[in-house]
C-alpha cells in the first residue's frame, strides 16, 4: 500500500466565490487548499502548514500578489508561485515573471491546466 503525501496550496484571492470554486477544484484533484482573502491575512497566519505552492491573485485589495511574492523572496522564502488574474496584459505578465512565478493564468483559463501546474510545482520542496 502506498502512502500519499498531501500537496498543500495557499490560495490568496479577494474573490470569495473564486476561492470556493478553486477550493472545490483542488480538493477534487487531491490537493489540500487553504484560502486567504488577502495577502495580509496570509502573512498573519502563523499556524499554516508548509505550503508546496502559492496560488496568488495579482490584483488584491491592499498588498498585491506580486508584492507578496517579492516580500517572501526578500525574506528568503522561495515557494513555487502561480499567479492568476482577471486583468491580463503584457505589462502585468512581465511583472509576474520578474517576480519569479512558476506559472501564470487568466481566471478564465482551464481548471485542469491550473491543477497540472500545481501538481508540477507541488513536487518541489516545501518552503513556507
Role assignments for model-derived ranges:
Residues 67, 88-103, 109:
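Alpha4 helix (beta4-alpha4-beta5 surface) of REC/receiver domains from two-component response regulators
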Residues 44, 66-77:
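Short amphipathic alpha-helix used as the core "switch/output" element in two-component signaling
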Residues 37-38, 64-67:
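Acidic catalytic/metal-coordinating carboxylates
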Residues 35-53:
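Acidic, metal-coordinating helix/loop segments flanking the phosphotransfer/catalytic sites
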Residues 1-10, 16-23, 38, 112-128:
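Non-catalytic signal-transmission and effector/linker regions of two-component phosphorelay proteins
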Residues 60-62:
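Receiver (REC) domain active-site loop signature in two-component systems and cognate sites
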Residues 75, 86-88:
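Short, conserved "switch-loop" micro-motifs in signal-transduction and mechanochemical regulators
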Residues 57, 85:
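Active-site residues of response regulator receiver
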Amino acid at each position: 500500500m502506498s502512502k500519499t503525501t498531501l500537496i498543500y496550496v495557499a490560495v490568496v484571492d479577494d474573490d470569495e466565490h473564486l476561492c470556493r470554486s478553486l477550493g472545490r477544484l483542488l480538493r477534487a484533484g487531491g490537493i489540500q487548499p487553504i484560502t486567504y482573502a488577502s495577502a495580509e491575512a496570509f502573512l498573519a497566519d502563523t499556524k499554516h502548514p508548509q505550503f508546496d505552492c502559492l496560488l496568488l491573485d495579482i490584483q488584491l485589495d491592499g498588498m498585491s500578489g506580486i508584492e507578496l511574492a517579492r516580500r517572501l523572496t526578500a525574506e528568503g522564502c522561495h515557494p513555487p508561485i502561480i499567479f492568476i488574474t482577471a486583468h491580463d496584459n503584457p505589462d502585468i505578465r512581465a511583472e509576474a515573471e520578474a517576480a519569479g512565478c512558476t506559472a501564470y493564468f487568466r481566471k478564465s483559463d482551464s481548471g485542469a491546466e491550473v491543477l497540472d501546474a500545481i501538481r508540477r510545482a507541488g513536487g518541489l520542496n516545501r518552503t513556507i
